[in-house]
UniProtKB/Swiss-Prot annotation:
Gene Ontology terms describing biological process: DNA damage response; protein folding; response to heat
Organism: Fusobacterium nucleatum subsp. nucleatum (strain ATCC 25586 / DSM 15643 / BCRC 10681 / CIP 101130 / JCM 8532 / KCTC 2640 / LMG 13131 / VPI 4355)
Protein name from the UniProt record: Chaperone protein HtpG
Family, per entry: Belongs to the heat shock protein 90 family.
Residue span of region B: 324-534
Gene that encodes it: htpG
Compartment annotation: Cytoplasm
Amino acid sequence: MKKEEKIFKAETKELLNLMIHSIYTNKEIFLRELISNANDAIDKLKFQSLTDTDILKDNDKFRIDISVDKDNRTLTISDNGIGMTYEEVDDNIGTIAKSGSKLFKEQLEEAKKGDIDIIGQFGVGFYSGFIVADKITLETKSPYSENGVKWISSGDGNYEIEEIAKQDRGTKITLHLKDGDEYNEFLEDWKIKDLVKKYSNYIRYEIYFGDEVINSTKPIWKKDKKELKDDDYNEFYKATFHDWNDPLLHINLKVQGNIEYNALLFIPKKLPFDYYTKNFKRGLQLYTKNVFIMEKCEDLIPEYFNFISGLVDCDSLSLNISREILQQNAELQVISKNLEKKITSELEKILKNDREKYVEFWKEFGRSIKAGVQDMFGMNKEKLQDLLIFVSSHDDKYTTLKEYVDRMGDNKEILYVPAESVDAAKYLPKMEKLKEQGREVLILTDKIDEFTLMAMRDYSGKEFKSINSSDFKFSDDKEKEEEVKKIADENKELIEKAKEFLKDKVSEVELSNNIGNSASSLLAKGGLSLEMEKTLSEMTNNNDMPKAEKVLAINPEHVLFNRLKSSVNTEDFNKLVDVLYNQALLLEGFNIENPAEFIKNLNSLIK
């Protein structure tokens, strides 16, 4: 029988070195590669049998076998697939198909940069065995050959290839494991079972470890939806994504067309425990041909849906050299966009049909949606704006922006007020007057709410307006405005003196009839609101953080204004201004600078 000793071509040597030292940073995925090759070999045999019915003979129960021999430190993977002839082994294993071509050399150079699909294009996953083995023995037989073939190499530049007597069709690969504790675990039963479950659990063919089948041949996402109950989804979710709770929602997608894929997505009930830590990573599990490729594929899901768990299985996706990072290709982008639309659509359905369930979702994950609206200066506004909900003064319940607009009648602006709580907002002086007018206000209790609305600018052509802004008006009563302006002109000295006392604490002092029944109110002028200032100051202790341009508004109809007028030339004037200013600070949730001074002034004025 034929026997030869050969030398790897230069490119193959280089690839071997690249595979061992550069491409696979995760040692354990060698088993995934070899099982995937075995799966492909059976696929090829089944395809061939469609036109050559005699090829299977009496060996038509397809299977993959794994065994270990601790004494000899070997791990063996075998299949009863198509096998290879002597020439095929020499071409596909010894020299690698196309290895002498200009294309391969170019791709090899690109592989060093980590961005090319060598495995997918040239089938070199076999060489990943050298990550854990210092010698590999391959025995194979094609149904079209009388003899089998043995191939042996230590990965040192040479290989032996010879014909052998072999009866059974298929391929057996024996890895002679390297010495060292880090390789010993690959001889343990539990480790092999764990790796198969992790990477190859849904291979189409049964994987045997001894007499035990250790994989599930048909994944849940490829089963008929009619076969599945909520319990099936719930148990799969909890076992796969390590959650104690059932998911809030599952989405099972089977897409056919130019790009075919299956997707199974889950919205959890609770935020992941590490959600706000640097360890948290978004992404979906990725399978290709039922082979696990990646734990967290970020490209499949946008940042604002980062809380979603799940997986995608697509046979046609192009993979990079290590099968760990996907190339940025058109297929992936299409799948990602489709998933984004489907998730949005499902959330909108819940919002419409089960408000209580949506509110439960919103309290956990609403911040991610709001952050998505803010991202890129509101670029995602159109996609996400109809998922937003806020508590409304209309009925103290959550409302959508569309529902608000449908109720606003002839009003031109969507009113909102930032507040520590719904109760705190309800008792603000301005809110009482707006309630009397029958005008609805969105109550923003999350510190990022106002940033979200500012990023949006408007909804359905209606601009957002804070009732704490200096240009907010209860009405367009020109006569009333002129009356207030006249009072201000008459008390110009009072206003200037108050501003002089407060110095740079406020940018100006004004009289206003738009602050309800309160004696005074702190308003914001310009783009930065009072609530934004508080939020930014809590994020950092930096004194250089931007401040809101504050306006102290005084109610000319309040009794304290009359007292202020009568004391303009007395020592009580500054005390009254101090009380009005600090009172306004407290109403807006700010800390007053000197509580003792405030109490002292307040007590001295109570006569």
